Amino acid sequence: MRKYIPLVLFIFSWPVLCADIHGRVVRVLDGDTIEVMDSRKAVRIRLVNIDAPEKKQDYGRWSTDMMKSLVAGKTVTVTYFQRDRYGRMLGQVYAPDGMNVNQFMVRAGAAWVYEQYNTDPVLPVLQNEARQQKRGLWSDADPVPPWIWRHRK
């Protein structure tokens, strides 16, 4: 019974661990990083649970363009959980119509599930669907995940 106490505390503290930002996207850096104007300053957001191709990687520019078409200049809602080691907020991004942008990027084949850190059980299902239907980066016979591509560079 005692081993479940930390889990129960975590579950009940979840609402305290996350917060929302509402703001206009002022910059799209790549397929998984945006800047949102929050009150008076731009806040860098790293989309949680996904990893998009790097700009110089195959499909990198396409992934960035996909993100731009979804959110550039639009007001989004970001549910953020924490900051990463680079100071970026890790968050779930929702388009003005409520669409989950993180999930859309994976479904479109514009990003991988960041399996090492993923907490969204829907993402692997969406990635398998994109792979089977050869969407986006999955149209490549052997796409290289960004974490492997970065390691090689």
Curated annotation (Swiss-Prot):
PROSITE patterns: TNASE_1 (PS01123), TNASE_2 (PS01284), TNASE_3 (PS50830). CDD domains: SNc. SUPFAM superfamilies: Staphylococcal nuclease. The keyword Hydrolase applies. Keywords: Endonuclease, Hydrolase, Nuclease, Plasmid, Signal. The active site is at R46, E54, R88. This is Uncharacterized endonuclease. The keyword Signal applies. One of its GO terms (molecular function) is nucleic acid binding. InterPro entries: SNase_OB-fold_sf, Staphylococal_nuclease_OB-fold, Thermonucl_AS. Belongs to the thermonuclease family. Its EC number is 3.1.-.-. PANTHER family: EBNA2 BINDING PROTEIN P100 (PTHR12302), SERINE_THREONINE-PROTEIN KINASE 31 (PTHR12302:SF3). Residues 1-19 form the signal peptide. Gene3D superfamilies: 2.40.50.90. It is an enzyme of class 3 (hydrolase).
